[in-house]
């Protein structure tokens, strides 16, 4: 047997090679699982702290106000009314299936100066989606957001903050920058109150923060949006007392170069997001 074949198959012949393959199979499957689900660890606070661009850390004098899980006709209009009264704008991460049912709400969001962004098509766990579903659904949601709002969306936030490899690639192919949050209100929890929401947000509130709240109970208990709504005036007031302006992600200074340049750098492995990702998970930037 030629030497290179002996090395490839093993000196014990094909049977020995098969035994080696069987032994390596669990390790290979584990590596594939890590490749798929590894990015999902980004929802954990220690990981997000190592990925400031992904977490949404922005300008020091600004706080980005963001809402997930809408639009819902029973709650989103109330948030829009309150934001109008407060003179604030925000970014709404919408679900495609809800925007499809209530496009008028999407138009109102944009018409009142807020920003639409992509939260996916449905509020499912990205880690258990069959192959290809996330790519199709993220693309479908992005197209709908653009059709309703008249502006190509810039941001993607996965449900539960679980950023699978497929979701990451699908978002980037659509020119969407994945962004999570630096602080949330835990407004979906049973027993949440305006006071608890404000206290939870305030614990991590500082310049450059991205705040996550919910304008819908689509993925939580009925009425769970009320504490967040009632906490808004005090939250905006607290930001003002800290000398911080409140607004959408588009005004937050997240990320680096314009989208076209960023996309080109992503594909050659040199975008800010890619470098941070590599630094966090491999200890290198790939330069």
Where are the regions that the model predicts?
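N-terminal membrane-anchoring alpha-helices
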Residues: 2, 6-55
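A short acidic, helix-capping loop that chelates divalent metal ions and anchors anionic groups
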Residues: 124-129, 187-189, 218-222
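C-terminal domain-boundary segment and adjacent tail
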Residues: 41, 45-58, 85-86, 100, ...
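His/Asp/Glu-enriched short active-site or ligand-binding loop at hydrolase and phosphoryl-transfer sites
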Residues: 162, 168-204, 244-255
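Divalent metal-coordination and catalytic microenvironments
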Residues: 68, 83, 92, 116, ...
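Charged helix-capping and loop-helix junction motifs
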Residues: 131-138, 192-199, 225-232
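Active-site beta->alpha N-cap acidic-glycine motif
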Residues: 41-127, 133, 137, 144-149, ...
